[in-house]
A protein has these predicted regions:
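Active-site metal-binding motif and surrounding structural segment of the metallo-beta-lactamase
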Residues: 93-133, 234
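Pre-active-site segment of Zn-dependent metallo-hydrolases
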Residues: 65-108, 143-147, 153
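Short beta-strand micro-motifs in enzyme catalytic cores
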Residues: 4, 62-64, 75-79, 173-175
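Metallo-beta-lactamase
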Residues: 2-23, 30-33, 47-61, 83-92, 121-173, 214-229, ...
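Short amphipathic alpha-helical segments
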Residues: 98, 121-124, 145, 202-203, ...
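Short, ordered loop/turn segments at secondary-structure junctions
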Residues: 114, 136, 241
Length: 266
């Protein structure tokens, strides 16, 4: 009988197959996540899929989002763009996989930071592809696999249309993706939650820890702003439903960094 690869209920990270659940989830024990009042809890992919379904929406021409309803764990979505699967969700059912493949097939999965590693190995096996993670976050890989490839440095081209950029902030290896053909060839920033789109979609914010509300220091915001200033993009798409900026995205992100710095200096 095959062993279950247990999944953390709080963060959605999947661990290697085992007879019993792990004793702890290091990702949730880190101050950028949390262990809930009920303590460490575990589930399986089959249980995640029971009573849940894939939510699929086109965000702009050539960009499709796939999420989970009802939500699970952190609740992020994955974005599919011209052969790239950006970020990952835990749910892997036939409809979710079909939606990803229908969006053009996948040549690589790239993930912004460890909170969204989720069931990346299962997805990579299902899609017969590789997973690209920044080497600065290697300690947070809870399920090692030959399909997981680490990249180093500040930028990595993925095909003709995408570039991974190490932005840092939330995690040392925190990565954003620039899709050159997005926003009618003006460029699109796939931001995860390293750049968190605010409720009015006119501003964004940045955090070291979202659940524990720990801000980033001014020196890190200044460094991130310098990186963002070098990028070309018009639209921004974040990790969660509704976190989409259709126009003037770069100006809004830079203005938000300035506002953040001003608040820290008061």
């Amino acid at each position: 009988m095959p062993l279950d690869a247990f999944v953390c209920v709080t963060c959605g990270t999947q661990y290697p197959p085992s007879l019993t659940p792990p004793d702890r989830c290091p990702i949730c024990l880190d101050e950028r996540q949390y262990v809930g009042h009920e303590g460490q809890r575990w589930t399986t992919l089959a249980e995640v899929a029971s009573g849940r379904a894939a939510r699929i929406e086109e965000l702009e021409p050539g960009l499709v989002a796939v999420g989970t309803e009802p939500g699970f764990a952190i609740g992020q979505r994955t974005l599919i763009s011209h052969g790239l699967m950006w970020d990952c969700i835990t749910l892997l059912d036939d409809r979710a996989a079909a939606a990803v493949q229908a969006a053009g097939g996948i040549s690589a999965i790239a993930i912004s930071h460890p909170h969204y590693y989720s069931s990346m190995v299962e997805w990579a096996e299902r899609l017969d592809t590789r997973v690209l993670l920044h080497e600065a976050d290697r300690e947070w890989i809870m399920r090692p696999d030959p399909r997981v490839e680490l990249w180093a440095g500040e930028r990595l081209r993925v095909g003709d249309e995408h570039e991974l950029v190490r932005l840092g902030g939330h995690f040392d290896g925190g990565t954003v993706c620039v899709w050159r053909a997005g926003a009618s060839e003006q460029g699109c920033l796939l931001a995860g939650d390293l750049v968190q789109v605010a409720a009015d979609r006119d501003w964004v914010s940045f955090m070291y820890s979202y659940p524990n509300m720990i801000p980033l220091p001014a020196r890190e915001i200044r460094r991130m702003r310098e990186v963002i200033e070098t990028l070309r993009f018009e639209s921004v798409h974040g990790a969660f439903w509704g976190q989409d900026i259709a126009r003037d995205g770069k100006r809004k992100v830079l203005a938000s960094a300035d506002r953040y710095l001003a608040a820290l200096s008061r």
